[in-house]
Amino acid sequence: MVRVFQQHVPNSNIVETNTLYKGDRYTTESHRETLKINGWDFFPVDIMDENGTVMLPVRNGKHFQEISMGKNIVNYDSMIVLTHFKGHAMGGYGGSMKNIAIGCADGRIGKSMVHGVSVDNQPADWGQWPSKERLMENMAESAKAVVDYFGKHIVFINVLRRMSVDCDCAGLSAAEPTIPDIGILVSTDLLAIDQASIDLCICSTKQSRFSRTY
């Protein structure tokens, strides 16, 4: 799918940011090595916070007036958001909203702002977890900053297959997929595609753990 995209989108890059938690993608150097090990080096990859951060405004935000993103995001005028849809222990689900809310936020400041209880836009200490409701509101505001920045030049693709109740960040400890493969959804509306994905998961099996949990 990625190869096909790049054939039809001239001068495109895959964009990433480093992680907040220590691991194989914590630094730019280890991140690039991880991409290489996993065979994801057949296209240009821009680790957007490699050269620093930039603050994007959150218009009419409840918790944030602005949020920290990987600096290189401002080098782009459009974005295709490709997301593996799944569950999430704190956010309820991991869809396009979470993908851009966490995925575009830089690995130190922005991700800490979203995950922590921030005061005056200052990130909280790692591990000072907010309530699930606050985390989801933080993610919504971070995603809004990205959507507002790109305007009409952003499209979302949710892949509904091999869906676990756990986020991909759980790695090998993630629960085995419990929801039947459904297909691929595409939309220019962030809320519509994530809501449709949730509805399809719940309707696919009312007895699934995903449905009972979320």
Go through each PLM region and give its residues.
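Extended, low-polarity segments enriched in aliphatic/aromatic residues
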Residues: 1-214
